[in-house]
């Protein structure tokens, strides 16, 4: 039965490890807009026949509201098949499979990555961690039992950029968790600076990833792009024009270094519609940067299904 459950779970993961409305415990207080058409099963580059058989056992629906304009297919881009060994490890599940999600306040708030974590635990087993209650006030580290299953750690810092985590102590902390997969979610705060420079941003990503690779040589990586944000004072707020460049730089880095990327920014509408889509569904908080619980639930749902 556990083996079958793993196949079912893999099909769910194969549809976004990365950004959430499938289970009753995740329902928002306010109704989420109607869902659009079902997605075709996501093809993971290099998937085994055994993995694909499992994917056919479950139907996964697109959780983007049908009225989200200029949205793209919710997939992880991984032409080099860099995540295939990780997905195989999920399928085998002979011990704990450890995921460390690092990022800015979107990760620090815990809601979006927590939904991803709970869904993965549902699909692959929660026996690897002790039951816990996670809120904004608690830490986001899971506590292992030693049993097989998903171990999902959340390490977010308010205002963080990739430079924030390019620190020996933070790298040591991440390495001490023995990650199989590291999810890297930055870009919002880099793009918020008026002095943003694309080339400097790429160099900063490279420094962080270089440190992580050296400290965690067995880990695989998934980069994500930011969801979009506004800048300026409340009554004169405009869509941040630098986010499109920041998202492009993250995606370029991933492609150049044969890493997987989940391009949330363009999936939810990109330059023309990402912020407008979030806004018309009242998913932004008043600051135009952070999101309501509904907004983070949707991101978490997307993240889980893209995987």
Which residue stretches match the model-derived regions?
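A short, charged/proline- and glycine-enriched loop
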Residues: 92-97
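Catalytic cores of extracellular degradative/oxidative enzymes
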Residues: 165, 180-182, 191-255, 274, ...
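Eukaryotic extended interaction platforms
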Residues: 38, 42-47, 52-56, 60-69
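Stable alpha-helical elements in mature extracytoplasmic
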Residues: 79-86, 108, 112, 116, ...
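Bacterial Sec-dependent N-terminal signal peptides
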Residues: 1-39
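Coil residues (strongly favoring Ser/Thr
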Residues: 31, 63, 71-75, 79, ...
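Catalytic His-Asp segment of secreted/periplasmic serine-dependent ester chemistry enzymes
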Residues: 30, 226-306
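Conserved SGNH/GDSL esterase-like catalytic core that processes O-acyl groups on lipids
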Residues: 98-101, 106-203, 207, 214
């Amino acid at each position: 039965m556990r083996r079958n459950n793993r196949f079912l779970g893999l099909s769910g993961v194969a549809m976004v490890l990365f950004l959430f409305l499938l289970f009753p415990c995740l329902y928002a207080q306010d109704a989420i807009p109607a869902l659009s058409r079902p997605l075709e099963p996501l093809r993971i580059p290099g998937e085994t026949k055994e993995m694909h058989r499992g994917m056919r056992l479950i139907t996964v629906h697109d959780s983007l509201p049908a009225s989200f304009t200029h949205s793209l297919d919710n997939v992880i881009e991984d032409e080099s098949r860099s995540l295939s060994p990780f997905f195989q490890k999920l399928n085998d599940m002979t011990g704990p499979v450890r995921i460390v999600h690092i990022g800015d306040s979107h990760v620090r708030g815990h809601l979006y990555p927590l939904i991803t974590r709970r869904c993965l635990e549902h699909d692959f087993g929660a026996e690897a961690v002790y039951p816990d209650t996670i809120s904004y006030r608690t830490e986001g580290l899971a506590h292992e039992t030693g049993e097989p299953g998903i171990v999902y750690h959340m390490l977010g810092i308010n205002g963080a950029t990739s430079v924030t985590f390019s620190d020996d102590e933070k790298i040591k902390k991440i390495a001490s968790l023995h990650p199989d997969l590291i999810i890297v979610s930055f870009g919002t705060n880099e793009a918020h600076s008026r002095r943003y420079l694309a080339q400097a941003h790429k160099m900063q990503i490279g420094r962080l990833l270089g440190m992580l690779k050296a400290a965690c040589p067995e880990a695989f990586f998934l980069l994500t792009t930011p969801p979009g944000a506004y800048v300026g004072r409340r009554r004169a707020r405009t869509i941040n024009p630098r986010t499109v460049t920041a998202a492009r730089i993250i995606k370029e880095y991933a492609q150049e270094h044969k890493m997987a990327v989940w391009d949330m920014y363009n999936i939810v509408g990109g330059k023309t519609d990402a912020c407008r889509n979030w806004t018309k569904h009242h998913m932004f908080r008043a600051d135009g940067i952070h999101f309501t619980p509904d907004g983070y639930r949707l991101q978490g749902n997307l993240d889980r299904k893209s995987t």
